[in-house]
Curated annotation (Swiss-Prot):
GO biological process: histidyl-tRNA aminoacylation
Keywords annotated in UniProt: Aminoacyl-tRNA synthetase, ATP-binding, Cytoplasm, Ligase, Nucleotide-binding, Protein biosynthesis
Name of the protein described by the UniProt record: Histidine--tRNA ligase
Keyword Ribosomal protein: no
């Protein structure tokens, strides 16, 4: 009989397993902490949505919609898509649940997996883990600065310092149409291939986002949006920069920056880390003042960002840093015999109820094997219990780092460990 075939994760989809997963969780939690401190509530979104939401919200001309979405028909023959980004889904939820009818701005944060069919490479996966925030309903440069500062604070809380913030303005409906005509006039004079020409007709900004060296060389002299802003857009951008200066958030103005989604207006930004090579982006976002109305809601503005958790982990590795996760457990129980195991199972339950992380040597490993497991667990303390200790009503409390040990009455061990274990 042939051996049964084994399975592996789909190409480009990573697993997160202990102990490395502790680093991933610590980075994700660190990136969301700054948003919580600024009053951003958690929002949980569906993994898949109506395909039309992303086609309309993200933009038909984007690579995300035209090349990278996981789209399929469900059993009801409805076209659905695994979410490629978070903003469109947030806006749909805000409209559907009338959050925009309450106190503004609506401030939400989220974390979870998103899906894009692209060539897998280091830190670029087909299932990407992302943290994001959105602030909806108020057009205020100070709010733009707050959102950007939250991302900056998240990175710095992890000890990351080799990143930089690049920022620009993409204008709005008062100045973009004239700039669009100017840019198209420039692009149509170039020897572009048919596909690139088509993109230039739909959304010429997409061409400036092209990563191919020959296209980048041809468009090096293209007119820049930053040079054609309306007075109101220029004033908005200048005020954002003034707020960032006041907050001590360093930045570099990059007039050639174009984000990969069509809904961005005015303030647009990206965080990059040169330790990641050509694929240097670790997060970014911007203002999207027409998106809610485009999706059937009120004409309210919004701004947000998405940060790649996987990319941030790689950036920390490039700097030789780790967000030191805590030990997996605080206490490891080593029973010698069935009665001792029953007693330690009860003690472990009591310790956990008091907020102490506890594991136990299951199976019949013997003392030597159990103590090795205790050392590998990262615990600070081992509880060793055998027949003699049971008869005396005590347990051995051993400090694993120093080897020091003492006997403690069984009815006092919970209080004793509360003093010994640091959280």
């Amino acid at each position: 009989m042939s051996k049964a075939s084994t399975f592996s994760a789909p190409k480009g989809i990573p697993d997160y397993v202990p102990p490395q997963s502790a680093e991933f969780v610590a980075v994700r939690d660190g990136l969301t902490r700054a948003a919580r401190l600024a009053g951003y509530g958690h929002i949980e979104l569906p993994i898949f949505e109506d395909t039309g939401l992303f086609a309309r919200g993200v933009g038909e001309s984007t690579d995300v919609v035209s090349k990278e979405m996981y789209t399929f028909a469900d059993r009801g023959d409805r076209s659905v898509t695994l979410r490629p980004e978070g903003t469109a889904g947030v806006m749909r939820a805000v409209i559907e649940h009338s959050l925009d009818r309450g106190q503004l701005p609506v401030k939400v944060s989220y974390a979870g997996p998103f899906f894009r069919y692209e060539r897998p490479q280091a830190g670029r996966y087909r299932q990407l883990q992302q943290v994001g925030v959105e602030a909806i309903g108020i057009d205020d440069p100070a709010l733009d600065a707050e959102v950007i500062a939250i991302a900056d604070a998240g990175f710095r809380s992890l000890g990351l310092d080799g990143f930089r913030l690049e920022i620009t303005s993409l204008g709005d409906d008062t100045c973009r149409p004239q700039y669009r005509e100017l840019l198209q006039e420039f692009l149509f004079a170039l020897p572009l291939d048919e596909d690139t020409r088509r993109r230039a007709e739909i959304n010429p900004l997409r061409v400036l986002d092209d990563k191919r060296p020959d296209v980048r060389e041809m468009t090096a002299g293209a007119p820049l949006m930053l040079d054609h802003l309306s007075e109101s857009c220029k004033a908005h951008f200048d005020e954002v920069l003034a707020h960032l200066d006041a907050l001590g958030v360093p930045y570099v103005v990059n007039p050639r920056m174009v984000r990969g989604l069509d809904y961005y207006t005015k303030t647009t930004f990206e965080f990059v880390h040169d330790g990641l090579g050509a694929q240097s982006g670790i997060g970014g976002g911007g203002r999207y003042d027409g998106l809610m109305e485009q999706l059937g809601g009120q004409p309210l503005s919004g701004i947000g960002f998405g940060i790649g958790v996987d990319r941030t982990v790689l950036a920390l590795e490039a700097e030789g840093k780790s967000v030191a996760p805590p030990a997996r457990v605080d206490v490891f129980c080593v029973p010698m015999g069935a009665e001792a195991k029953a007693a330690l199972v009860k003690i472990a339950h009591q310790l956990r109820a008091n907020g102490i992380r506890v594991d136990l040597a299951y199976g019949n490993r013997g003392v030597k094997g159990s103590m090795k497991a205790a050392d590998r667990s990262g615990a600070a303390v081992a509880l060793v219990l055998g027949e003699r200790e049971l008869e005396e009503g005590v347990v051995v409390v051993k400090q694993l780092a120093t080897g020091e040990q003492e006997t403690v009455p069984l009815d006092q061990v919970v209080d004793k460990l509360g003093d010994l274990v640091e959280h």
